[in-house]
Regions:
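Active-site glycine-rich loop that binds ribose-phosphate moieties when present
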Residues: 102
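Long, contiguous C-terminal flanking segments immediately downstream of a protein's structured core
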Residues: 1-48, 53, 65-68, 84-92, ...
């Protein structure tokens, strides 16, 4: 594992991606903890943390410019609270192939009102009962979930499912959280096989499409 230091950040690739966003490439260093990002001087629109060992999405300083975070193929099982305070413009959070377990663990994203794109593909959470409708209900700001546009009929179905006392009871039953996090606990001894290079490229293309889609909506 490699500690995310200011020196590493300075050495990593930095470039303008196809949608003209400034991107920092931190892929493949087996970084366990997000830290020291103040060293970026808030100069990036996108940070790519793919292929590391991050277990919790937190540790961000105030980064007013950052809009897109890619965390494909890590070990993420927790999302920190109050992300909106440190990432006031966060639009995209890609968590494909991680270890998110319980629907209630997504509740910390409720306050991130700027979030429009979320991917939880290849996470245990996606096999939970009513997964997609629960996320649509809890995170109405999300327009693209697992690279599929949230349709109006899905919003209506989610509203109906969680309406009234029965709906509230169902949401409470579904929305339990994982037990208190202990580093290394309840994690597989072998990391599941991650996306292939082709998969990663596809995710990149999809993310670029999301950015274009978001910008188009913003300009309407």
């Amino acid at each position: 594992m490699v500690k995310l230091t200011p020196e590493l950040i300075e050495q990593c690739a930095q470039y303008i991606n196809p949608v003209r966003d400034r991107e920092l490439d931190l892929r493949g260093y087996k970084i366990p903890v997000i830290e020291n990002l103040g060293a970026t001087l808030d100069q990036f629109d996108t940070i790519d943390f793919s292929d590391n060992d991050v277990r919790k999405v937190d540790g961000f300083p105030l980064l007013k410019r950052l809009r897109h975070i890619l965390l494909n193929n890590n070990r993420v099982c927790r999302i920190g609270e109050n992300l909106e305070e440190s990432l006031p413009r966060l639009e995209t959070l890609i968590l494909t192939n991680n270890n998110m377990q319980e629907l209630g663990d997504l509740d910390t994203l409720v306050s991130v009102k700027t979030l429009t794109c979320l991917s939880l593909l290849r996470n245990p959470i996606t096999s939970k009962r009513h997964y997609r409708l629960y996320v649509i209900h809890k995170l109405p700001q999300v327009k693209l979930l697992d690279f599929r546009k949230v349709k109006q009929k899905e919003r209506e179905a989610a509203s109906l499912m969680f309406k009234g006392k029965k709906g509230q009871t169902l949401a409470k039953d579904l929305g339990k959280r994982s037990k208190t996090f202990v580093p290394g606990a309840a994690l597989p001894t072998e990391k599941s096989s991650g996306p292939s290079p082709a998969d990663i490229n596809a995710i990149k293309v999809a993310t670029i499409s999301i950015v274009i889609y978001s910008d188009a909506n913003r300009n309407e």
